[in-house]
């Protein structure tokens, strides 16, 4: 049984990037789907596909993106911030800036999963799930 599904999600992506895999398959949940859509929207992953099966959990297949010349990923680090044992909540005025705007913080807000920039524009605070840069 996985006690922290977000940490598992980030670890699977991190390990696949280090092993230079093109595709990584992850057990699906609504939170992971929203995070995957955000990563695609921000250009960190190439593509994704949700394999929903009736009466089963389903999975998410993520196509990882690499620079053709240097063969490096746009994702250098995936860092879990809010953990099950210690949640990290921030107000709209205290939203973090990751690498002076070069990275993103993924937040869970009352309006759903969004990046720090979107939350700043909407003046929303929430739980800081992770940093990606």
UniProtKB/Swiss-Prot annotation:
GO terms for biological process: translation. Gene3D superfamilies: 3.30.1370.30, 3.30.1490.10. Pfam families: Ribosomal_S8. The keyword Mitochondrion does not apply. One of its GO terms (cellular component) is ribonucleoprotein complex. InterPro entries: Ribosomal_uS8 (IPR000630), Ribosomal_uS8_CS (IPR047863), Ribosomal_uS8_sf (IPR035987). Keywords: Ribonucleoprotein, Ribosomal protein, RNA-binding, rRNA-binding. Belongs to the universal ribosomal protein uS8 family. One of the primary rRNA binding proteins, it binds directly to 16S rRNA central domain where it helps coordinate assembly of the platform of the 30S subunit. This is Small ribosomal subunit protein uS8. It comes from Amoebophilus asiaticus (strain 5a2).
């Amino acid at each position: 049984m996985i006690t922290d599904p977000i940490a598992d999600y980030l670890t699977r992506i991190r390990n696949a990037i280090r092993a230079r895999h093109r595709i990584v398959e992850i057990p699906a949940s609504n939170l992971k789907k929203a995070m995957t859509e955000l990563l695609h929207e921000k250009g960190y992953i190439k593509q994704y596909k949700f394999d929903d099966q009736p009466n089963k959990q389903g999975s998410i297949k993520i196509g990882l993106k690499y620079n053709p010349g240097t063969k490096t990923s746009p994702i250098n680090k995936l860092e879990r911030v809010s953990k099950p044992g210690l949640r990290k909540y921030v107000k709209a005025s205290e939203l973090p800036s990751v690498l002076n705007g070069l990275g993103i913080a993924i937040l869970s807000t009352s309006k759903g999963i969004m990046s720090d920039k979107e939350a700043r524009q909407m003046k929303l605070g929430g739980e800081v799930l992770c940093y990606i840069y």
